[in-house]
Amino acid sequence: MLELEESSKIIEKIKYNKPLIHHITNYVSVNDCANIVLALGGSPIMADDPKEVVEVVSKASALVINIGTLNDKRVQSMLLAGRKANELGIPVILDPVGVGASTFRKDTVNQLLKNIDFTVIRGNASEMQVLMNMNYSVAGVDSMDFGGNTPKMIRTLAQKYKTTVAITGATDSICDGTTLISVSNGHSLLSQVTGTGCMTTSLIATCLAVTDQALLAALAGVLIMDLAGEGAYASLKAHESIGTFKVRIFDHIHQLTEQTILEGGSLDVSYR
């Protein structure tokens, strides 16, 4: 499958280029996000003060904006860094963590979407449903309920925001508005580790840093986490559980090869 082959090639590009990935992210998973980028072969920097974000992002190959733990200062930094990244052609990925939890989060994401062009948006289905129903409207789409129809929602969302969207969950879906990819890899234990979604966003950003194909970068990032989850679970012994599982995720990503993706990836691709 072409998409699987092309996404697998990203692994070696990362190891060769060692791209700098700028994060403005939350303090819950920041250490894990830094380490996951390192495990894949990139170089993380977690700068979030308005006094330095423009300078830092100018040296980066991709920018992560994650709203997990918001405050006014961090929002200012997100806007400054995002605009500068757009100006320089640096890819930007949005992770709207818990966007439906508060008006502040929704207002912030609305502001970000109005002021920054995002290369990829990654979140879970409930977060994406909130984005779909926000007042920021393109082509008259204001409020829609897709009743669990993820393929329809993700296509509409990608078209609405003119971006590539990745919805992660039991089955992962990635769409650029035209091509829809469903990924059947992963393990249920991933949902019991705080920050695996944030780490997946960081993996996608690292992939974005070495390709201009956002759909393939999003696919590669999702597959890397899913296959690492499968491998980590398979390696557990009878007395080992969630803590060992988390550590093994990093081990498996560090040992990941192009062949791992080619042999392990399970995809379904449709076009429109």
From Swiss-Prot:
Keyword terms, alphabetized: ATP-binding, Kinase, Magnesium, Metal-binding, Nucleotide-binding, Thiamine biosynthesis, Transferase
Keyword ATP-binding: yes
Root EC class: transferase
Known role: Catalyzes the phosphorylation of the hydroxyl group of 4-methyl-5-beta-hydroxyethylthiazole (THZ).
Stated name of the protein: Hydroxyethylthiazole kinase
Catalytic function, reaction form: 5-(2-hydroxyethyl)-4-methylthiazole + ATP = 4-methyl-5-(2-phosphooxyethyl)-thiazole + ADP + H(+)
Source lineage: Bacteria, Bacillati, Bacillota, Clostridia, Peptostreptococcales
Pfam families: HK (PF02110)
Binding site for substrate: M46, G195
Origin: domain of life: Bacteria
Gene3D superfamilies: 3.40.1190.20
A biological-process GO annotation: thiamine diphosphate biosynthetic process
Species of the source: Alkaliphilus metalliredigens (strain QYMF)
One function term, GO molecular function aspect: ATP binding
Residues binding ATP, per UniProt: R122, T168
Keyword Metal-binding tagged: yes
